[in-house]
Amino acid sequence: MLKDMFSKKKRYATIPSERAKQEVPEGIMTKCPSCRTIMYTKDLKKNLSVCRTCGHHHRMSARERIDSIIDDGTFKEAFASVKGGNPLQFPGYEEKLESDRKKTGLNEAVVTGEGKINGYPVVIAVMDPNFRMASMGSAVGEKLTRAIELATETSVPLLIFAASGGARMQEGMLSLMQMAKTSAALERLNRAGGLYISVMTNPTTGGVSASFASLGDYNFAEPKALIGFAGRRIIEQTIRQELPEDFQTAEFLLEHGQLDRVIPRLEMKETLTKLLAMHQ
């Protein structure tokens, strides 16, 4: 008996069966990539996709972003029919576009329209990173330009939420032309005395960061957003120097005078309301 008490017992672990795994619907839980906390996805969405534990700002779709900023029942989408093609006959590009259209329900990587923020009218454009990583091709540039022109014609403040991997490589020079196209439209808005508020979210990189996203009368960003043109590794290899750990973060850019403010998502609507009230 004593021998049995002190003998080493084998330990066993129960491995859930495939059937047991399937009982938990996919997407019901979300793990925070910052603090590793596991939470109900619906609770995360209720908090505007901001982690209650560490404050990490999770990715939002364009529709979710609009719902969080624009007053209920006031958003009117514009230019929804504009969508890109495959002008350079890039292999597999059309299939990828169609796949993203089915996945997101969008024709392109930006949603544009008009709405109100606590009663103040705005023209708004929101990029959706779930569609080709919100890269800017001809259609995205066209929709943004039309939104800018609408703000110019109606003398209504323009609000753009940027989130992009940069220019869309499958469209070559046509995608790069959108940098100049959107910037020229913003210059016309500026000459007309219009107000442009730019909010950069994670990530805002490449040709988008080097064009319209950085040309606001006010340039804001969400906390910890990655903002920059070239990648960190490319820059380090070019200048042969090690970059600071927080390089290309919203906080780094704010410290070096390239942003006006870093605004937590839960404070975004209130902050924008105060700003719009100042410019009435």
UniProtKB/Swiss-Prot annotation:
Its cofactor is Zn(2+). Residues 28-280 form the CoA carboxyltransferase N-terminal domain. SUPFAM superfamilies: ClpP/crotonase (SSF52096). Pathway: Lipid metabolism; malonyl-CoA biosynthesis; malonyl-CoA from acetyl-CoA: step 1/1. One of its GO terms (biological process) is fatty acid biosynthetic process. Zn(2+) binds at residues 32, 35, 51, 54. Keywords: ATP-binding, Cytoplasm, Fatty acid biosynthesis, Fatty acid metabolism, Lipid biosynthesis, Lipid metabolism, Metal-binding, Nucleotide-binding, Transferase, Zinc, Zinc-finger. Its main location: cytoplasm. It is an enzyme of class 2 (transferase). One of its GO terms (cellular component) is acetyl-CoA carboxylase complex. It holds the Pfam family Carboxyl_trans. This is Acetyl-coenzyme A carboxylase carboxyl transferase subunit beta. It comes from Shouchella clausii (strain KSM-K16) (Alkalihalobacillus clausii). The gene is accD.
